[in-house]
């Protein structure tokens, strides 16, 4: 891996369980522990759970360096109405651009701006279809 590519990752490559646990701890500390129920584990595990539970899957890509991330997390993700609606109707997986799995997924999804949310319909344990995607400045709450 080139030194430039290594420099965009702030932590060593870890396993997805550790990455998501670290992200949740980061989110709890920086924003609030009042947020949707973030799934732990890999993105693939989140897809499997969503398929098994017949739920849509929201994937949030977090860029700690993006100017709109703090406002989005504080005003949208941590809002009571978003939390209640999301927990009742979806499963929610989040990843940081500083983690390899989330970064790789963002490339596959052609993420061009942040904040970035994708809603997936999980058609099997390995197949998903994008139901909707939201990127850039997202207003509400």
Question: Where do the model's predicted regions map?
Answer:
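Non-catalytic, surface beta->alpha helical segment in thiol-disulfide oxidoreductase systems
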Residues: 3, 72, 111-141
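Core residues of folded domains in eukaryotic genome-function proteins
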Residues: 52-58, 88-93, 113-118, 130
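Thiol-based oxidoreductase modules, predominantly thioredoxin-like and allied folds used
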Residues: 36-41, 61-65, 78-103
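Beta-strand elements of modular eukaryotic interaction domains
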Residues: 44-51, 81-84, 93-94, 103-110, ...
């Amino acid at each position: 891996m080139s030194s430039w590519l290594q420099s965009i990752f702030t932590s060593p490559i870890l396993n997805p369980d550790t990455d998501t646990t670290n992200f949740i701890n980061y989110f709890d500390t920086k924003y609030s522990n009042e947020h949707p129920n973030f799934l732990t584990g890999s993105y693939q595990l989140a897809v499997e759970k969503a398929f098994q539970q017949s739920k849509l899957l929201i994937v949030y890509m977090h860029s700690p360096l993006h100017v709109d991330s703090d406002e989005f997390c504080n005003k949208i993700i941590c809002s009571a109405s978003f939390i209640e609606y999301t927990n009742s109707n979806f499963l929610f997986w989040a990843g940081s651009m500083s983690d390899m799995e989330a970064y790789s997924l963002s490339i596959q999804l052609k993420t061009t701006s942040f904040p970035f949310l994708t809603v997936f319909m999980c058609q099997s344990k390995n197949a998903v279809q994008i139901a909707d995607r939201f990127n850039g400045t997202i207003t509400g709450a």
